[in-house]
A protein has these predicted regions:
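N-terminal secretory signal peptides that target proteins for export/translocation
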Residues: 1-3, 37
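Patatin-like phospholipase
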Residues: 23-133, 141-444, 448-460, 471
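C-terminal outer-membrane beta-barrel translocator/porin domains of Gram-negative envelope proteins
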Residues: 456, 475-480, 607-720, 727
Length: 785
């Protein structure tokens, strides 16, 4: 049941579970010193498992015939003692043994490795070699470059581990043009060959994970040979192309570890040359043989992964069967790796889940406990003299850590569709000494542009290498909305990015299916290296229902069909500030209006200018940021003569960690002798029509006027990252004159609860307008525009 719960958790909430298994055959080195002499020249290379498969096969066969693995940890260590007696003639004196430590993968459970390091350090055990897979590679890597166990513990306690699995860009950092296209996306799937949707290669590209790892190892990323660290290190990853385990000892340590923890379906694979890396736990979750290749005589292994468990067939489902069957060989490989160990430790982590990163102290304590349970064996390995030599070596290496690197050139790798010239706008004009934040800024600017699944940097001598993985050019999108006014709405469409020379093209095509159907197509062309000048085009067709109109002795609904074709020039003054000027042609056809004089079709050209500034962290119930837009439209033609102005602004002010205070004002007005229905101001309900203002407690569109002003104050209490409660007071002034502030007044009081989900926002509340009945509010999904 625990495996089932973990699988469901990560499928629906995009969290991480490390399967921690392998499917490659292991090798027992019965006489490691003799055998390793044959491959000593390979110890500083990236070594595939096939490179060591043929080493002393006769020893392997003899061993497997004579020995079998029992599951109890105690028996494993007893057999290790027996093995040492049998090979006594080849035994190296205890004080001269070179000790290696292998740390397995296991996501949050891998934090138990820190507790074991603390005990080994206290007892002055001179660990000269460390290997790791997945989470184990992070801990092993930190230990190898010179972090002390105490420092690693402090980092683990203060680090936001779940951030590794979230590549989400803050909305304000995307920029206004991306937000115009992407704001209401719920489900986005890339299009493959023949325009067929396909699943992405991973839930996250791994950009944040790479950035966090570069931060941890920044001082040492200039050293590209891991055997030159104070403790020789190797990370283990799986080559997806060949299915082989790969021992990585060269390159960027941050990239090597990122490859080792690339959980299939969670992280996108990492490409390095001809190899495509995924999590090393798929083939070798406990990298013991890699210690022997590095040169270890005595091996300690710490396993925090799962093993074989007895299944109840009545409680199994399809996911359980698929998961278990695909990892059988992997679990067998872990057991084969255990046979190579001299000391095996498996902390008791049954009460912890793979995603329990909030229980850092408890998990570390579990690791410390298993080490103290084996304290007698650990003390036999104590060698204060050699330990002090290693400690001095560690301190000397730490002195070489640097805050800056002298960069003389910048290369882009991984780009195919986007040529090198495309990246010039993101790169500094002058090179020289660069620190981590400056390198991260370059990567962030490239990634925030939205054309790459991941981006990360490496330092190779004096060269800064920016690695990118390009996104597909086209996507299919899907979202929907359910509310108590327009009922159900489904939106589907296409989005994408294209490059035409120096022109970056973003496009969007959406279709709305409901009682109020419509089609919207938008294109944004970025001109020049900095894309400060934009050509914008928009085609819009929609069928709006205008509700609750008073005529004669009752209320009725009618239809306004709008068609608009518009183009213009935009100037991106800053990342979140856009000035637009343009014009187009529009039709407005009114049907079923009880006032027969207003039925009919108007055709007219129009001109429009707008200014928009937007730094909100969300378009629905933001907790911080500013939003302002002002749009002026006019027409002077046979069918239409009007001037219209729409303005709105809000400031979302955080008050402490939980509260957000939001004052907001909106003004909508029109004046002219012949005003199309599209530009007639309306007030009430949830805003879904053109030229309407939201006002809870009133039926949709019930109040009309030539000028409407609404002011409101909202207090939002954020219960968690996804849940909140809010209360709002609003006041409206209505006038029958254009560009006026009227004397007719309406007030609204609202209280409700909201939720933010991957599929869109949800809200339920109640609202009261004096003189109206108490009304409820129900909305799920982005509101149709």
């Amino acid at each position: 049941m625990k495996r089932k719960n973990m699988i469901y958790f990560f499928i629906f909430f995009i969290f991480l579970i490390n399967l921690s298994f392998s499917d490659e055959k292991g090798i027992f080195l019965e006489n490691p010193k003799e055998n390793l002499e044959k491959i000593s020249d390979e110890s500083e290379k990236n070594i595939d498992i096939k490179d060591v498969k043929n080493i002393r096969k006769d020893n392997l066969e003899k061993f497997e015939k004579k020995n079998f693995l029992k599951k109890e940890d105690k028996n494993i260590n007893e057999r290790s003692e027996s093995k040492k007696s049998e090979n006594k003639k080849n035994e190296i004196p205890q004080k001269d043994k070179k000790i290696g430590l292998a740390l397995s993968g296991g996501t949050a459970k891998g934090l138990a490795h820190i507790g074991i390091l603390k005990v080994l350090d206290e007892e002055k055990v001179p660990v000269e070699f460390v290997t790791g897979t997945s989470m184990g590679s992070i801990i092993a890597g930190m230990y190898s470059v010179g972090y002390t166990p105490k420092e690693i513990e402090e980092i683990a306690e203060n680090m936001d581990w779940m951030k590794l699995f979230n590549d989400k860009i803050e909305r304000r950092n995307k920029g206004i043009t991306r937000n115009m296209i992407e704001d209401q996306n719920s489900i986005v799937l890339p299009l493959g060959k023949k325009a067929m949707p396909k699943l992405p290669v991973g839930v996250v590209g791994g950009k944040t994970a790479s950035q966090q790892l570069n931060e941890l190892f920044y001082g040492a990323i200039g050293t590209d040979d891991f055997t030159k660290f104070p403790r020789k290190f190797a990370a283990v990853a799986t080559d997806l192309n060949s299915g082989e385990g790969v021992m990585i000892t060269k390159g960027s340590i941050a990239t090597a570890i990122r490859a080792s923890l690339s959980l299939p379906s969670i992280f996108a694979p990492v490409r390095s040359g001809d190899r495509l890396y995924i999590d090393g736990g798929v083939v070798r979750n406990l990298p013991v043989q890699d210690l022997k290749v590095l040169g270890a005589d005595y091996t300690i292994g710490v396993n925090v992964g799962d093993g074989f468990v007895k299944r109840d067939e009545n409680k199994m489902n399809l996911i359980d069967v698929i998961t278990d069957s695909s990892t059988i060989a992997g679990r067998q490989e872990v057991e084969r790796q255990i046979r190579m160990l001299d000391l095996y430790m498996k902390p008791d982590l049954e009460k912890f889940e793979a995603y329990d990163f909030s229980k850092v102290k408890e998990i570390i304590a579990a690791g410390e406990k298993i080490a103290r349970d084996n304290i007698d064996k650990i003390r036999e390995l104590s060698n204060p003299k050699l330990y002090d030599e290693l400690e001095e070596k560690r301190k000397e290496f730490r002195k070489t850590w640097t805050d800056e690197y002298n960069i003389t050139s910048i290369d882009i790798e991984g780009n195919k569709k986007y040529k090198d010239s495309y990246f010039k706008k993101f790169l500094p004009k002058k090179l020289g000494n660069m620190n981590r934040l400056e390198m991260e800024e370059i990567v962030n600017e490239i990634y925030q542009n939205g054309n790459f699944t991941t981006a990360y940097y490496e330092v190779k001598n004096n060269k800064l290498v920016i690695n990118v993985q390009e996104k597909p050019s086209d996507y299919v999108t899907l979202n929907g909305n359910i509310n108590n006014e327009d009922k159900a709405t489904i939106n589907f469409g296409f989005q994408g990015n294209k490059v035409l020379g120096d022109i970056n093209v973003r496009y969007s095509s959406n279709t709305t299916v409901s009682n109020e159907y419509g089609i919207n197509n938008s294109v944004i062309l970025g001109i020049g290296k900095d894309e400060k000048v934009l050509i914008l085009g928009n085609l819009d067709y929609k069928r709006d229902m205008i509700y609750n109109q008073n005529f004669g002795n009752g209320y009725y609904d009618f239809v306004n069909k709008k068609f608009s074709l518009e183009t213009g020039v935009g100037f991106q003054i800053s990342k979140n500030l856009l000035l637009f000027a343009g014009g187009g042609y529009q039709t407005s056809k009114v049907e079923k209006n009880q006032d027969q004089r207003k039925n009919g079709k108007k055709r007219f050209p129009f001109f429009e200018t707008s200014l928009t500034y937007d730094t909100r962290n969300s378009i629905e119930s933001p907790t911080k940021g500013i939003y302002f837009t002002s749009k002026y439209t006019f027409s002077n033609s046979k069918d239409a003569n009007f001037n219209a102005l729409y303005q709105t602004g809000e400031v979302n002010i955080p008050v402490g960690e939980k509260l957000t205070f939001t004052p907001k004002v909106s003004y909508l007005t029109v004046k002219g002798s012949d005003i199309p229905e599209t530009y007639e101001p309306k007030l009430g309900g949830i805003k879904t029509e053109d030229n309407s203002l939201e006002f809870f407690g009133l039926p949709a569109d019930k109040v009309r006027g030539e000028s409407i002003f609404v002011g409101s104050v909202k207090l939002q209490y954020n219960i968690s990252k996804i849940l909140y409660a809010d209360t709002m007071y609003s006041r409206a002034y209505i006038s029958d004159e254009g560009f006026d502030f009227g004397s007719r007044k309406r007030e609204s009081y609202k209280l409700g609860f909201g939720v933010k989900t991957p599929l869109g926002p949800g809200y339920f509340g109640i609202a009261k307008v004096p003189g109206e009945t108490l009304r409820y509010i129900l909305n799920f999904g982005y509101k149709p525009q």
